[in-house]
From Swiss-Prot:
It is a single-pass membrane protein. This is Matrix-remodeling-associated protein 7. Residues 33-121 are annotated as: Disordered. Its main location: membrane. InterPro entries: Mxra7 (IPR026622). Residues 76-85 have a biased composition (Acidic residues). Pfam families: MXRA7_helical. It is found in: Membrane. The modification Phosphoserine is found at residues 79, 165. The chain crosses the membrane at residues 7-27. Residues 48-65 have a biased composition (Pro residues). Keywords: Membrane, Phosphoprotein, Transmembrane, Transmembrane helix.
Amino acid sequence: MESPVELLAALPALVTALALLLAWLLLRRGAARVPAPESTASDEAPGAPAPPEPPESCAPEPAPEGPSQSERVAEPEESEAEEPAAEGRQDEDSDSEMGPPTEEPEEEDGAAFSFKYSPGQLRGSQYKKMMTKEELEEEHRVQKEQLAAIFKLMKDNKDTFGEMSDGDMQEQLRLYDM
């Protein structure tokens, strides 16, 4: 009777240990990709297992250039700390380091950043910064068409939505900056 209960109690600890092990393996495998071009520069014992792994991961390496740089940062930390818990924290740190660098160039290159414009699909106030004057006019035109269609549906279905006066319409237009 106690055996299943003990197993259920130990299950979260086992899952956590498994997650830490997987994170450590992924971090180690990612760090093994980085030394492949620099194998002549580093002849340390931790680098010795790396040469067999690069042939498997040589093809995907050129595509993710940004994450490999953050993995280079994570590699020295890995050699300093040997505990799985510490390496789990390093994995979280490397994930947080990988996220912002990919987002920052998009924000910094706001003027140079190109996107496929499709009227009526943008949300928020950032679209005003990203669009040309013609695109802004097109966006406002599409918004007006959409609001006109909404108001027409509301007038056609008075029993569902209730009466809508001209003042109500003007107030709605004011909310949409129209």
